[in-house]
């Protein structure tokens, strides 16, 4: 089996490859010229479906996996939410987005507050489109700690831990992450449709 990932995000692709060991995982950009996919949905699920469908239309008959994920901070009105990848503006780096969120907390004198990650996975297959979700709850802090992971990991402390995802061992992160939970369900779906 081969899975085409509808992303160019190296961090996401690396995480997906680790999860689906023994299955060929290819970013779509290795098969077709990369292009910008307009994510104009109002939820993580909407955007994951848009990405999966868009790549599937270019590579019909394949299995396309798309992820849309982000972090939501309720005390800030749920931001960055679906705008997590572009919170600091179009073309912003992970680091830019991270420090923008830290600045938003500091502006309000918030040292630590509840937040959660959401991951929506869409699978576009010859049998239709399937979706799964995963969540990870915890707190964000007003500083970056650790250099593991990517995105907002250095400021997010998962529930039950005292270290940020940027400080935790990658195997621990893999076992508790929102994306891992959604990918686990996606893996079950894939096995059921491939039998």
From Swiss-Prot:
GO biological process: nucleotide metabolic process; purine nucleoside triphosphate catabolic process
Domain of life the protein comes from: Bacteria
Binding residues for substrate: 7-12, 69, 150-153, 173, 178-179
InterPro entries recorded: dITP/XTP_pyrophosphatase, ITPase-like_fam, RdgB/HAM1
Gene Ontology cellular-component terms listed: cytosol
Cofactor note: Binds 1 Mg(2+) ion per subunit.
Location of the active site: 68
Cofactor(s) annotated in UniProt: Mg(2+)
Cystine pairs: none
EC number in record: 3.6.1.66
Reaction equations catalysed: XTP + H2O = XMP + diphosphate + H(+); dITP + H2O = dIMP + diphosphate + H(+); ITP + H2O = IMP + diphosphate + H(+)
EC main group: hydrolase
GO molecular function: dITP diphosphatase activity; ITP diphosphatase activity; metal ion binding; nucleotide binding; ribonucleoside triphosphate phosphatase activity; XTP diphosphatase activity
Alphabetical list of CDD domains matching this protein: HAM1
Residues annotated to bind Mg(2+): 38, 68
Keywords, sorted A to Z: Hydrolase, Magnesium, Metal-binding, Nucleotide metabolism, Nucleotide-binding
Role this protein plays: Pyrophosphatase that catalyzes the hydrolysis of nucleoside triphosphates to their monophosphate derivatives, with a high preference for the non-canonical purine nucleotides XTP (xanthosine triphosphate), dITP (deoxyinosine triphosphate) and ITP. Seems to function as a house-cleaning enzyme that removes non-canonical purine nucleotides from the nucleotide pool, thus preventing their incorporation into DNA/RNA and avoiding chromosomal lesions.
Family under the similarity heading: Belongs to the HAM1 NTPase family.
Oligomeric form and interacting partners: Homodimer.
Protein name in the entry: dITP/XTP pyrophosphatase
Organism of origin: Nautilia profundicola (strain ATCC BAA-1463 / DSM 18972 / AmH)
